[in-house]
Amino acid sequence: MRLKNKVCLITGAGSGIGKETALLFAKEGAHVVVNDFNEESGQETVRQICENNGEAIFIQADVTNPENVKAMVDQVIDYYGRIDVLFNNAGISGVGQLHDIDLETWNRVMNVNINGVFLVTKYVVPHMMKQQSGSIINMSSCIAEIGLANRASYATTKGAILALTKSIQVDYAKYNIRVNALMPGTIFTPFVEDYLSKDPNPEEAVQSIKRRQLGGDLGKPIDVAFAALYLASEESKFMMGTPFMIDGGVVNGKLG
């Protein structure tokens, strides 16, 4: 097992990529800490893990709330004594052209997607420093590398996460802490499915996205989960401050 007895904290693990990653990590022997704002969905992830003889606990917390985050990290340390892997997966989308976005909406996307990563990492890192080990996986996006219409706020956050990843890797490498970023393309999560269903022509919207993929299909949450597993495991011990693309060739095709 690639993560046997590793304590892995995954934010936003109630659905989509976070849930799929939690299930996979548990199969690989990890003690999974499932975090989500939605208690029902988070508990369902834990139920499925335990049903398959894995180990997991659920902690409800809002990643934008410092008190919530500190209490969550303290609870993990009290229960397991350490945190080996942090997957900063929680995030929200932002849709709209810049001139149409109001400040409240802009700040909400910044708060969840940037401040959430900052806060959870801030409270986890001191424990990894004491351990002299750890792997931090931040969720960026291939949108940080290419332009995409109507995604100004979301793209801003994902570019920031990539910069943050590279910067803090320099700070914490001496503590044997690795910090890397996942950069998925369009992944067919429940959120994306719901978003596409609201398009005037859902089928054409799906086909349009598929045409941008060199592989001709949409990604699935498990595709990203396997990449996260690699970054969480010792197999990736020489990857530090690295953007890891799982984009179906979108960036390569765009640049080509």
Predicted regions and their residues:
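Active-site helix of classical SDR
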Residues: 121, 157, 165
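Substrate-binding pocket helix/loop in short-chain dehydrogenase/reductase
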Residues: 97-98, 105-110, 209
